[in-house]
Regions:
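Catalytic cores of alpha/beta
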Residues: 104-108, 280, 340-354
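Glycine-rich beta-alpha loop elements in corrinoid/cobalamin-binding modules
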Residues: 2, 20, 26, 30-160, ...
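Short glycine-rich His-centered loop
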Residues: 2-19
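Flexible glycine/acidic-rich beta-alpha junction loops that bind and position SAM and/or redox cofactors
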Residues: 13-14, 102, 146, 248-249, ...
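Radical SAM enzyme core and accessory elements
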Residues: 2-6, 35-36, 40, 51, ...
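N-terminal [4Fe-4S]-dependent radical SAM core
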Residues: 10-12, 138, 144-194
Length: 454
């Protein structure tokens, strides 16, 4: 019987200081799909391993096929590990966001690239290899034919997500993941994906694998997996969808099912501000939601339009206040210095963000991800450094590194981020009265300094 070993090359040495570590659900889905078709499978999650340990585990599994997951921050480690294991298998396969966008960039080492969703493709690749036939009749793959890169027709996306088996979580080091979070936050959290695809077209967002077609699992199917995760000893769920609240009817169905089953599992999620009204927020809280995160990104409608966010500042304000009124903790993400911004729009965002009743906020500089409209507009600028995406140790810094020519200097934007954090935490700890005495002069002075900076 043919054997497949799947590898997630997210190495421990690069991420010892990382607060957030999640198991590779995508490979978990592929492993479960292979098992369902009778294929022998192993999964080596390198998150808590050294490179030497990872190589040893893969070799011990004695696979016919090795399949890698790769993304923007993993290309270098993926290629290095694949080169080490080239002679330990008959076939090397890779998939994920970056291979889907740039299959040719992987085919000097890999034999086959999976384009898009991988469950059916990887199963069919294994079956073809076992039969000794080629891959030209498969949809959604790329390979070299006489030295030339060949891409087959796109594969149809999985429409019925309930038809997929749950990820094979037995391959993950669940105890290590639980202890990682218990030591840092006092609770253990595990991700769960309830939908695929996003119908929006934000300027900075890349969707190479799941695309724009939104597909979702049924409420009962979702909560069945919540029960499975609870049985593994986790006490919190991270709904890892791009926007968990996109379909209000389904969302409320999930909430009702969670309440009905009395699982005592808390959870958190990402949301869009235009989907969060008071009724939704209240039902989410009653169903165990503790925290919701919004990608607000800017405090001006002009910049939101540049980003193609299809939201307004007023919608963002209402969503935050609706969530807080329901008893939810609220986090928000903002970008400073977006192409087309000026000093006033940056300061407007700083004022808006620091004035919201948030529990958590994050500011980043614009970082152009391959496959996005933002990337296409900025990649020709002289100071754009694509290689930074391929160096894992740089990823902790990438959100605060200016990767392209801009009307703002990196130092000026970092000053704005520091100013925003001081204003935000100053208002939280000093209160309105205390901050009005100390904070107003600070804001005026730092506004002036910011405008003078280049």
């Amino acid at each position: 019987m043919i054997k497949v070993t799947l590898v997630y090359p997210f190495f421990k040495p690069f991420y010892d200081n990382s607060l957030f570590r999640f198991p590779p659900l995508g490979l978990g889905y592929i492993a479960a799909s292979l098992k369902r078709r009778g294929v022998q499978v192993e999964l080596v999650d390198c998150t808590f391993l050294s490179r030497e340990q990872a190589v040893s585990r893969v070799r011990q599994s004695k696979p016919n096929i090795i399949g890698f997951y790769s993304m923007f921050s993993m290309k270098k480690t993926t290629m290095e590990l694949a080169a080490l294991l080239r002679n330990d298998c008959e076939l090397l396969v890779v998939g994920g966001p970056l291979p889907t966008l740039d299959p040719a960039g992987y085919l000097d080492i890999f034999d086959v690239v999976v384009l898009g969703e991988g469950e059916a493709a990887m199963t069919e690749i294994a079956e073809c290899h076992e039969k000794g036939v080629g891959f030209s009749d498969l949809d959604g793959v790329a390979f070299k034919d006489n030295g030339l890169v060949t891409q087959t027709s796109p594969r149809k996306q999985v429409e019925d997500l309930d038809s997929l088996p749950f990820p094979s979580r037995e391959f993950f080091d669940n105890e290590a993941y639980k202890q990682h979070y218990l030591k840092r936050f006092g609770y253990s959290i595990s991700p769960l994906i309830t939908s695929r695809g996003c119908p929006f077209s934000c300027d900075f967002c890349s969707r190479p694998v799941f695309g724009q077609s939104f597909r979702s699992r049924s409420a009962g199917n979702v909560v069945d997996e919540v029960e499975e995760i609870a049985g593994l000893g986790y006490d919190r769920i991270w709904f890892a969808d791009d926007c968990f609240t996109l379909n209000p009817k389904r969302l409320l169905g999930v909430c009702d099912e969670l309440v009905k089953r009395r699982l005592n599992m808390s959870w958190e999620c990402l949301s869009r501000v235009d989907t969060m009204d008071h009724e939704v927020a209240v039902k989410m809280r009653r169903a165990g939601c503790l925290r919701v995160f919004f990608g607000i990104e800017s405090g001006t409608d002009k910049v939101l339009d540049l980003m193609r966010k299809q939201i307004t500042v007023e919608q963002a304000r209402k969503a935050v206040y609706n969530s807080k009124a329901a008893g939810l903790q609220v986090g928000a993400f903002f970008i400073l210095g977006y192409p087309g911004e000026n000093d006033e729009t940056v300061l407007d965002t700083v004022r808006f963000a620091s004035g919201l009743p948030l529990d958590y906020l994050s500011f980043t500089l614009p970082y152009p991800i391959p496959g996005t409209s933002l990337f296409e507009r900025t990649k020709c600028n002289d100071c754009f450094v694509v290689d930074d995406w391929e160096e894992p140790k740089n990823m902790a810094l990438i959100r605060h590194k200016l990767l392209y020519s801009s009307g703002f200097s990196e130092a000026k934007l970092k000053f704005a981020i520091g100013k925003a954090h001081i204003q935000f935490y100053g208002k939280r700890f000093l209160g309105k009265r205390g901050y009005s005495f100390v904070g107003s002069p600070f804001e005026r002075a730092t506004d002036a300094v910011f405008k003078l900076m280049r």
